[in-house]
Amino acid sequence: MLDVKILRTQFEEVKEKLMQRGGDLTNIDRFEQLDKDRRRLIAEVEELKSKRNDVSQQIAVLKREKKDAEPLIAQMREVGDRIKRMDEQIRQLEAELDDLLLSIPNVPHESVPIGQSEEDNVEVRRWGEPRSFSFEPKPHWEIADRLGLLDFERAAKVAGSRFVFYKGLGARLERALINFMLDIHLDEFGYEEVLPPYLVNRASMIGTGQLPKFAEDAFHLDSEDYFLIPTAEVPVTNLHRDEILAADDLPIYYAAYSACFRAEAGSAGRDTRGLIRQHQFNKVELVKFVKPEDSYDELEKLTRQAETILQRLGLPYRVVALCTGDLGFSAAKTYDIEVWLPSYGTYREISSCSNFEAFQARRANIRFRRDPKAKPEYVHTLNGSGLAIGRTVAAILENYQQEDGSVIVPEALRPYMGNRDVIR
């Protein structure tokens, strides 16, 4: 959520920056108009209250002098009724303004490239060289089917499309990757492990920016008003909702494995085969709470930490800075890490690392004090995938496939796979 004071005092500057994102700006224009209406009503109410106080003194004088005060008393009753009606109008306007604030996206950081779509994203760096195959590389779902690692057909029978059963060494590979990633983030980068709930309440979804804008992409349990988490970012960020942290506690780093659940409402016909776009998938999420002045250094560190996983696995990738038109709703700046998938002949997103500045913290009311007597300030929050497990499985199967249909296990992963060096 944007700072209301900045939105009011620097409206045109904020609007200009939001225009760089593209899309509909109706809500921010409506916010300006309703806020003007609210301030006008408040001024009128204050004027009426001042008038009422003056007339009350006149009524007191008339009563002391035993003169007729009824006309003024009747007038003040009418003024009192007007004040009540206007106070109710103000309350309604404030409720609508609060709703509008929740629907206005974050302002892009000045370093974000200006553009309209993913075509305008800017490549920052690459690591590794895509492998040259002496045979036609197969897509991961064909490799997995031949090796008995994944079963999409039976998952469709049990649950529906965009679900999968991991079986045998496929299940072990998934579990190995979870442990491998967590061990690196915990032991080398100092994250604290969190195992979060998979169901959250509405306030949590609002806190991280999933609601109200992305309601159609969430799985909702109507009977209890719970939501299945689309990412561990939601419960882990809300871990400190409505709290004031001590400056000495910052930065806070959390790493969380969880299943993630997404309706993929806008993805009909896209990535219908394989692991790239599932309703349920596993992910290791990295979440940071930091001081505002440190957040952009922390974003660079976060991105490098996610990259480390791909480097250890020997998977070629690139890092791109998202342009303003491709930036997520809550993010001020985002780097996408894209892994090379031979069957696609291109790089596909495997991690998204974002700095939200105070946007989420303001929605979730997460603050800190620089010293015990200082006024609380909003923290900056960051998060990134470290990594998406299913897409990592897909990348390993495709990049390490052999002509005989077997798959080499990346060396760093072998201790987690019972020292197995090949899947056949």
Curated annotation (Swiss-Prot):
Enzyme class: ligase
Pfam family, any one: tRNA-synt_2b
Annotated metabolic or biological route of this protein: Aminoacyl-tRNA biosynthesis; selenocysteinyl-tRNA(Sec) biosynthesis; L-seryl-tRNA(Sec) from L-serine and tRNA(Sec): step 1/1
InterPro entries, alphabetized: aa-tRNA-synt_IIb, aa-tRNA-synth_II, aa-tRNA-synth_II/BPL/LPL, Ser-tRNA-ligase_type_1, Ser-tRNA-synth_1_N, SerRS_1_N_sf, SerRS_core, tRNA-bd_arm
Cell compartment(s), UniProt: Cytoplasm
SUPFAM superfamilies hit by this protein: Class II aaRS and biotin synthetases (SSF55681), tRNA-binding arm (SSF46589)
Annotated positions binding L-serine: T231, A232, E233, E285, S385
Signal peptide region: none
Gene3D superfamilies: Bira Bifunctional Protein, Domain 2, Serine-tRNA synthetase, tRNA binding domain
Known EC number: 6.1.1.11
Entry's Gene Ontology BP terms: selenocysteine biosynthetic process; seryl-tRNA aminoacylation
Keywords from the named record: Aminoacyl-tRNA synthetase, ATP-binding, Cytoplasm, Ligase, Nucleotide-binding, Protein biosynthesis
Gene Ontology cellular-component terms listed: cytoplasm
Entry superkingdom: Bacteria
GO molecular function: ATP binding; catalytic activity, acting on a protein; serine-tRNA ligase activity; transferase activity
Residues at which ATP binds: R262, A263, E264, E349, I350, S351, S352
HAMAP family: Ser_tRNA_synth_type1
Subunit structure: Homodimer. The tRNA molecule binds across the dimer.
Domain notes: Consists of two distinct domains, a catalytic core and a N-terminal extension that is involved in tRNA binding.
Full protein name: Serine--tRNA ligase
Origin species: Geobacillus kaustophilus (strain HTA426)
